[in-house]
């Protein structure tokens, strides 16, 4: 145990470790706040669809040889979120079909562009890094950290300011519309915020693993709590804890950060399932 603490203290002296912890905590917090809403609205796969769009956008940025890819990826992903929401409201194209169409199309086009126009000598490594997250946390620059901090503050502020509206739209959209609430506008707001979170999370966990940050904390919290507020708070705490534990474990074991965080979240979900079963039996 002493050796582990000494090793962690040694790594803590390096800025890239602090950057990874800051970004990991912020992304985990933001994704968990919106995760409860997405799960309850059965929009869980919108995160998966938009993450594939972000991969395609990353490929376009690489083809255009743009150094700072995040602004372009952010714009394309947000526009796709709007398109996805509008297409899902089409009676001829259902929501799940729209997600599958945009998701698979973006992934295929992105990989095709990277194969045709890539000048990298390690294409498979670049693709793997984009899909599953960087194998090294050295890739986070101070600019990316500050951008993540700014966008995370914006996401949390939006969630707090529109908490009651999001709550109403999440539980009973029909009633919210009948009460005069602009439900479509708040659905759009949720989709845009999710798009922002996905772009921020790509460097840490990759485009294919982002959905885990959204789904697992929410499902784990729902096993133990019933009210929307309690579930949201529990999901946020669990998500941040799993992110911290996953990053520290990846440092000690030398494993990919994203995969390690998701593995910890799977373990937390298993424990919460058991806890929920025990608590449910006691209540009966």
Per-range role (PLM):
Residues 1-29:
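Membrane-interfacial amphipathic/re-entrant helices at transmembrane-helix boundaries
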Residues 4-10, 103-160:
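Transmembrane helix-bundle core of multi-pass membrane transporters
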Residues 21-25, 70-75, 97-101, 145-150, ...:
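Hydrophobic alpha-helical transmembrane segments
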Residues 23-31, 57, 61, 72-84, ...:
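Alpha-helical transmembrane segments in multi-pass membrane proteins
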Residues 36-121, 221-233, 250-254, 277-278:
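Short loop segments and helix-boundary regions at transmembrane helix junctions
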Residues 140-217:
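Helix-loop-helix "hairpin" substructures at the membrane interface of multi-pass membrane proteins
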Residues 203-259:
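Transmembrane alpha-helical segments in multi-pass inner-membrane proteins
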Residues 255-284:
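Cytosolic-side transmembrane-helix boundaries in multi-pass membrane proteins
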């Amino acid at each position: 145990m002493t050796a582990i603490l000494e090793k962690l203290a040694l790594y803590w002296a390096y800025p890239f470790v602090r950057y990874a912890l800051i970004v990991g905590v912020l992304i985990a917090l933001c994704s968990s706040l919106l995760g409860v809403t997405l799960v309850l609205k059965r929009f869980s796969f919108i995160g998966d669809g938009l993450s594939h769009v972000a991969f395609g956008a990353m490929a376009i940025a690489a083809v255009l040889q743009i150094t700072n890819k995040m602004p372009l990826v952010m714009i394309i992903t947000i526009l796709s979120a709007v398109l996805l929401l509008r297409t899902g409201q089409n009676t001829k194209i259902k929501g799940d079909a729209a997600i599958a169409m945009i998701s698979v199309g973006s992934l295929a086009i992105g990989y095709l562009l990277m194969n045709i126009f890539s000048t990298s000598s390690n294409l498979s490594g670049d693709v793997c890094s984009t899909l599953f997250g960087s194998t090294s946390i050295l890739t986070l620059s101070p600019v990316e950290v500050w951008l993540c901090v700014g966008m995370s503050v914006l996401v949390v502020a939006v969630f707090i300011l529109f908490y009651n509206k999001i709550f109403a739209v999440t539980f009973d959209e029909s009633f919210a519309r009948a009460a005069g609430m602009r439900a479509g506008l708040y659905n759009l707001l949720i989709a845009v915020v999710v798009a922002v979170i996905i772009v921020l999370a790509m460097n840490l966990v990759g485009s294919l693993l982002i959905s885990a940050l959204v789904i697992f904390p929410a499902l784990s919290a729902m096993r133990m709590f019933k009210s929307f507020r309690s579930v949201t708070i529990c999901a946020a705490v669990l998500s941040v804890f799993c992110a911290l534990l996953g990053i520290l474990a990846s440092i000690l074991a030398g494993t990919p950060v994203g995969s390690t965080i998701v593995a910890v979240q799977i373990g937390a979900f298993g424990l919460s399932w058991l806890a929920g079963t025990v608590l449910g039996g006691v209540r009966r």
